[in-house]
Amino acid sequence: MSTNIWTPRHILSLAEFTPTEYNIILQTATSFQEVLGRRMKKVPALQGQVVANLFFEPSTRTRNSFELAAKRLSADTLNFAPGTSSLTKGETILDTAMTYLAMGTDMMVIRHRNAGVPAAIASAMDRNGHQVRVLNAGDGQHEHPSQALLDLFTICKLLNSTEPRIELLETKKIAIVGDILHSRVARSNIWSLTASGAEVHLAGTPTLLPKYFGEFGKLRPSKLFVHWDIEPALEKADFVMTLRLQKERMSQHLLPSLREYHQLFGITRDRLKLCQPGVKILHPGPVNRGVEISSDLMDDPQLSLISQQVTSGIAVRMALLYLLGGGKADQ
């Protein structure tokens, strides 16, 4: 792998990523996916560096994926558990981060229920001249960059397994359906998919898809559309991304019932008939079977890319950690 291919910086949002930067990540992830296919699934790219996974919010896929990615790169890992940490004794989040910094941490992967926490920690590190890099692993309803990047990688690899690149999506239609209001995944995917040139259609109930989401479209003219009915979004779609109803983030009763939601916006075989032949389904997980997607569709290998998304996540997160670490070590 070439050296110095990336200017090391924090990854907090995809809002200002360029197509070139997306392609660097896709190409780097492709190299690491090849590594993961070997008998010895480990390279010394980050040997001697320390990655701290600071997850202030519960996570299964993202936390384990980042931990495994770091270990596959030979980094040392520190894993934070809020229930057994000094937070229970009144320590601030910033002081917790500074403690990990004092232990020699080179990169911090941070998840928090409140938007802006990773950015605040990154800003504090910069103000004090520390070289540690911060990667946003999901902050409130703001963004989840690594999830959107693994979604992008999964789609592009399907379109070209040897040379995935963002330009492959220029003629594609992608529907994002569900609880978009509370979804940090949706926000990051809006940035990445519209940057690719894809036509992105959002669909959800008016309570879960406020009209202001159309404002994103002003930054990417004629590439983002908002629908309060599912049919226009699915019509001739090449990919359908369905999102979990995040009941834990809902401050009020936004839906009459889960059954009615499934009737109106659930992905079923009948609804997929509106899409292009060969349509594929994505979901960031965890999935509420029978709510946002019919259980049989989730398990159908001809339609579902959900397992591939989880697998892709390791290679993509290896790429992100490698690039944040300087991209200088030989594999």
From Swiss-Prot:
Annotated L-aspartate binding sites: 89, 184, 244
Catalytic reactions of this protein: carbamoyl phosphate + L-aspartate = N-carbamoyl-L-aspartate + phosphate + H(+)
Pfam families: OTCace, OTCace_N
Keyword field: Pyrimidine biosynthesis, Transferase
Species this protein is from: Trichodesmium erythraeum (strain IMS101)
UniProt xrefs under PROSITE patterns: CARBAMOYLTRANSFERASE
Domain of life where this protein originates: Bacteria
EC number: 2.1.3.2
GO terms for cellular component: cytosol
UniProt keyword Transferase present: yes
Protein known as: Aspartate carbamoyltransferase catalytic subunit
The protein's annotated pathway: Pyrimidine metabolism; UMP biosynthesis via de novo pathway; (S)-dihydroorotate from bicarbonate: step 2/3
Subunit structure: Heterododecamer (2C3:3R2) of six catalytic PyrB chains organized as two trimers (C3), and six regulatory PyrI chains organized as three dimers (R2).
Any single GO BP term: 'de novo' pyrimidine nucleobase biosynthetic process
Known role: Catalyzes the condensation of carbamoyl phosphate and aspartate to form carbamoyl aspartate and inorganic phosphate, the committed step in the de novo pyrimidine nucleotide biosynthesis pathway.
Keyword Protease: no
Amino-acid positions noted as binding carbamoyl phosphate in the UniProt annotation, renumbered to this chain: 61-62, 111, 144, 147, 285-286
Matching HAMAP family: Asp_carb_tr (MF_00001)
NCBIfam families, alphabetized: asp_carb_tr (TIGR00670), PRK00856.1 (NF002032)
GO molecular function terms attached to this record: amino acid binding; aspartate carbamoyltransferase activity
Protein family (similarity comment): Belongs to the aspartate/ornithine carbamoyltransferase superfamily. ATCase family.
Name of the encoding gene: pyrB
Top-level EC class as recorded in UniProt: transferase
